[in-house]
């Protein structure tokens, strides 16, 4: 029988529910259990695909092409699993499906209501996520804060699950903030008490509290919360701020969180062996070298827009016993005149993805600086496309060369819309999304990065591609197309072989990086940057 764990949040948003859920998932997986995890987002968008990065942070893409919340990146990195489209559910997606069924007459004339139709659809998503992965345990995080109007149907669905599958198969974990008032010199439990009261008013009695805090929590505070919130005192778990996120599973294990969960759900599983994870954390805490990487992006005011990129760089740094000193460079600020001032102290330059015209000329100048000064450079998605544009302009002398997306009237459309995208009008969910194969050119830097594999599978999110009519001119000038689709139609990786490392990929390699198994192209780039710093 599948076990269901529901993680809710109270008092404030952005409290770290996703990290708590992911950490618990890692502990249960290391007990030998098969775990999956999902995120419920109460916003009305179908998915975050068309949302501004300033609003939402990065869009995380799964193998099957779902555009999802960035928390899924935490889930995959912590638990080391590949999730699917059932792992992110929004209000918009649920209402869209219910209304589509209503239009088809599938409700047989019934009045369509939040209860039971919306809640049934939500419960079906929970069960489908578990069944498609054949999991022993599914962890479901509900976005937002208890008390939000948007969350009510989700919480009602969670309440009903206890009746549907039995109380012994369901556990509710509530994550709250325990504020410390410096003037009073004490922690305040009232916000947590009121949050739990709100949750109980909706019919959900939490079985465990995870309290987010900056300071150590005395046992007396835990006992008080246990008494007023009606949970066992040992089930009041402290989640204190840490230097590195990957310490959190170890901190939770030290408080027997996973054992309490297993006892509640009657899961007979051996103790979690966290030896390898602990060794990784110890290594992360004691890195001996540092290298500076300049990230040239258009959304640098909100680092979450590049969360997976940053994590992938860190992972590759761990593999090289090196801390990444990340320099955030706003692409809007980069010009041909100041590129050396902004980028001259960087050991490597990464140009990640994005959409739209703003900042693209600055990215092109950053790429030009890297090429002309032989600074290791990695381009991702739009960064790959602009790498091609930069080469066309400044090596092939194609004045005004550009992407058709950015300048439809350009004489040299180096990047063009994909053929199967021409007639598509909707923006959302219509990109080339998900896992696709890439055939590597033997002897190339890309092939060497991937240990001379013939084909790798990586996740994509794009609508435009390299215009193949320009391939002969590029190749004649030494531009290497080192990765292509198996039918040779789509360019996936480009590089300049004579440079230390000048490689750009159309796909998003960062989405498959793990802290104990870094993505190979990122590792090759970071390794080159470290060598460049010596």
Swiss-Prot record:
Biochemical pathway: Pyrimidine metabolism; CTP biosynthesis via de novo pathway; CTP from UDP: step 2/2
Residues annotated to bind UTP: 13, 188-193, 224
Annotated Glutamine amidotransferase type-1 domain residues: 292-534
Keywords: ATP-binding, Glutamine amidotransferase, Ligase, Magnesium, Metal-binding, Nucleotide-binding, Pyrimidine biosynthesis
GO molecular function: ATP binding; CTP synthase activity; glutaminase activity; identical protein binding; metal ion binding
UniProt binding sites for L-glutamine: 54, 354, 382-385, 405, 463
Subunit: Homotetramer.
Note: CTPSs have evolved a hybrid strategy for distinguishing between UTP and CTP. The overlapping regions of the product feedback inhibitory and substrate sites recognize a common feature in both compounds, the triphosphate moiety. To differentiate isosteric substrate and product pyrimidine rings, an additional pocket far from the expected kinase/ligase catalytic site, specifically recognizes the cytosine and ribose portions of the product inhibitor.
Xref: NCBIfam families: PRK05380.1 (NF003792), PyrG (TIGR00337)
Protein name: CTP synthase
Organism encoding this protein: Streptococcus pyogenes serotype M2 (strain MGAS10270)
Upper classification of the organism: Bacteria, Bacillati, Bacillota, Bacilli, Lactobacillales
């Amino acid at each position: 029988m599948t076990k269901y764990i529901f993680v809710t949040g109270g008092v404030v948003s952005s409290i770290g529910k996703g990290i708590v859920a992911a950490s618990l998932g890692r502990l249960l997986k290391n007990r030998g259990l098969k775990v999956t995890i999902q995120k419920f987002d109460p916003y009305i968008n179908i998915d975050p695909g068309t949302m501004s990065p300033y609003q939402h942070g990065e869009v995380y893409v799964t193998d099957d092409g779902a555009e999802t919340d960035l928390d899924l990146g935490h889930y995959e990195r912590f638990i080391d699993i590949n999730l699917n489209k059932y792992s992110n559910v929004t209000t918009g997606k649920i209402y869209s499906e219910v209304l589509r069924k209503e239009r088809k007459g599938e409700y047989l004339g019934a009045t369509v209501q939040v209860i039971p139709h919306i809640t049934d659809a939500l419960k079906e998503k929970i069960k489908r996520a578990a069944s498609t992965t054949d999991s022993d345990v599914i962890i479901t995080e509900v976005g937002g804060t208890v008390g939000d109007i948007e969350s009510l149907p989700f919480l009602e669905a969670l309440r009903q699950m206890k009746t549907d599958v039995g109380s012994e198969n369901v556990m509710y974990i509530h994550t709250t903030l325990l504020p410390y008032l410096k003037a009073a010199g004490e922690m305040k439990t009232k916000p947590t008490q009121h949050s739990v009261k709100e949750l109980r008013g909706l019919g959900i009695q939490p079985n465990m509290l995870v309290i987010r805090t900056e300071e150590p929590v005395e046992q007396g505070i835990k006992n008080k919360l246990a008494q007023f919130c009606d949970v066992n005192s040992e089930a009041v778990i402290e989640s204190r701020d840490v230097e590195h996120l990957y310490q959190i599973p170890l901190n939770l294990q030290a408080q027997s969180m996973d054992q309490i969960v297993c006892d509640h759900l009657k899961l007979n599983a051996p103790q979690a062996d966290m030896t390898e994870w602990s060794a990784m954390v110890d290594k992360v805490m004691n890195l001996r070298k540092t290298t500076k990487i300049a990230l040239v992006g258009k959304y640098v005011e909100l680092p979450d827009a590049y969360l997976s990129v940053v994590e992938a760089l860190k992972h590759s740094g761990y593999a090289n016993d090196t801390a990444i000193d990340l320099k955030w460079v706003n692409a809007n600020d980069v010009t041909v005149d100041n590129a050396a001032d902004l980028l001259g102290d960087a050991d490597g330059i990464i140009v990640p993805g994005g959409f739209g015209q703003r900042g693209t000329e600055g990215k092109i100048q950053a790429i030009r600086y890297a090429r002309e000064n032989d600074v290791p450079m990695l381009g991702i998605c739009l960064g790959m496309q602009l790498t091609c544009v930069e080469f066309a302009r400044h090596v092939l002398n194609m004045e005004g060369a550009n992407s058709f997306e950015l300048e439809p009237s350009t004489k040299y459309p180096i990047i063009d819309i994909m053929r199967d995208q021409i007639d598509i009008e909707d923006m959302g969910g219509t990109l080339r999304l998900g896992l696709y194969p890439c055939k590597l050119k033997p002897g190339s830097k890309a092939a060497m990065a991937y240990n001379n594999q013939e084909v790798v599978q990586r996740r994509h999110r794009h609508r435009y591609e390299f215009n193949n009519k320009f391939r002969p001119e590029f190749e004649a000038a030494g531009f290497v197309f080192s990765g292509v689709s198996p039918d040779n139609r789509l360019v996936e990786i480009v590089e300049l072989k004579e440079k230390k490392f000048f490689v750009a990929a159309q796909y998003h390699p960062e989405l498959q990086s793990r802290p104990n198994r870094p993505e190979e192209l990122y590792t090759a780039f970071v390794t080159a940057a470290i060598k460049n710093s010596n």
